[in-house]
Amino acid sequence: MKETIFEIFVDDLMDSSYDEEDFERGDAGIDDKKAFMKNQFRTISLAEKNSLVQRTMKLYEAGALNKRVMDKATLVEQNTYIPSHKEIDKYENDTVPIPVAKPKNPHVDEPAFNVNEIMGRADKYIGTFNLGMVWVYPYLDDPPIKFGTRTLEHKFEYDLLSPANDSTMLNIENKLYPSISHYLIVRVAQTMPGFENVDKAYGVISDGPNRFFSVADSESRLMNLEQTVFSKEKTFLLQKAIRNKFDQRKFKDILIATGDKVLVYAPLKLTDEARRLKYQGLAKPINIVTESNAYRKETTNFLEKIRPTILPEDVIFSNNNAFKTSLEYDEFMEMFMVEKVKDISFTIKCVQVFCKHKDLPFSLTKCFVKKVLESFYGECTPVNYISGSAKKQYPYRFEEALSAQFQIRSRKETSFSMSTKTANLIFNKILETLFNLENVMKNGELPHIGGQNEIPMYATLFKIALMDSQWLLSKRNNKDLKFDTKSKNNNNIISAIINVISILHMDLSDNKKVGNCIYDSIDNIVDDVDIKIATSILTGKIQPLEEITVAKSKGSLRAQIIAEEEIRFGEEIEAEFNDEEVVEEGDVIEEEELDEEGGEEEEGIDYADELPEFDEEAYYEGVVRTITGHFESLGLDVENGIEDKIRKEAQKIEKIGNRLKINFYA
């Protein structure tokens, strides 16, 4: 029937394409043109032609073809009798006369399928459909369905939940299937005589490597099997295929996004075959695309069943494993973890450069890394199930991200490799960040979601708070805003530089003992290398030296850092500062001199006159004096001639502005 309707559509299309020359030639001209146009089908693949046939059938069922085609197709459908397989069997056996084809409407006594009418009846008992339900559409191009006068929300991503969706190949039992439905079709085919072998049954859905039929076309190749043939095994196979599909991260995220809403399949029109069997009172065949209501319900019920096993919407942050699970299975949390690993690793590398510069040990021992973490990220509080463990307790993505920065070895610790215990310590610090934010939210610093003190795992608010939590965590820990450079004022820039320098000089040295490590006193001179390292830590832009294990003089180290700065910052950022170098006294061109020489006056100068004058030279002189004064008050000596370096680095920090770290505690 599909082919017949397609032929009617093509004939009508060709009728409208005949030109005056064709008609002048009479019937012969029209026949020649028709033959020429139909011959074009030989140049397209069978799959492409089948796709056109399917689309035309959908348009016909939706009543979307023009009136001429609809009338012709309806007339053919009403006067066409399609014999059953049983009748054909009788004919082939020559035991009965050939059945007489009686023009009959197979739709007799069957009410017309009216989507709006059915949805209107359903409207009375699901008035909150847009809040409590998610509709799964078997076809990606299905139009939105209406509930009475309201249009049902149709979100494209939920089409991916349909067994008929073929967006990603599935590998089940070492064979590829475009969709769950294709897999079920093959298993249905295996119940047919001669198709027990899976390779033969596979031919029902494919006619060559990477050449698959559509679900509807694959079904048309199945014999008319009774429902009972497949029903016993159907549930097991369906669940097996769904588990395979939803083992993929993309589909897990889509299923989780549906929250706790009820999943419901959009109703479909009955196929011609289903209508015919229903009219004849025969057993309904297996139909994967237009599954029976029971089958659709079975699918959505199972999706709802596995949804909470992936990671439930209402999991509460009440134990360590819940956080660890979120870092493994939530894409956002995983990204946060990876970025945090990069940030911590970068800070460790910067401190290694500083230690080499000051002739201090900088191997990645557990006590060295712990000292860096506690100095910049707050005290390390052991997490119960990780503390003291020599086995890795972190997820794969953490290991992958950290291994991109350092080597992880079981024992040997060098300047570029750390032990599993040390890696556990870094993962522990990331978990602490989440615990701190949880406590802040529970203590009322941010609104909670759900019941009292409940923080849903997938709450958007928690994720927003995680990205904007610096001030909260600093406030909770009663710490000053050491690294707060979010507001563009010189106090934050000054405090950022001072505090990083003080941490490097005071916390990481001065005979302090951490575990079995004793840090020797270092010289108390603040030089240009110290300033550059502090800027690196604050901006995250200037990478530390790569070959930090090679012994080099301080002068050589300075040269390397300067070269590294030029490479990492790039020409664009350097250009921003080239025009802002301090000019020698006497080289400044006064504005009056420029005017006398006929220099052009800047557009908008009248508005500028109304603003208070800004003396940039005096501003940065004040910044430098404040910073050097603080260094001296801390007992640190400032190297002669460093003022210009402090000024330039302060300008860089200010230029980057809101791209700076707000602080290290979040």
Swiss-Prot record:
Source species, domain of life: Viruses
InterPro entries the record matches: YbiA-like_sf (IPR037238)
Name by which UniProt lists this protein: Uncharacterized protein 149L
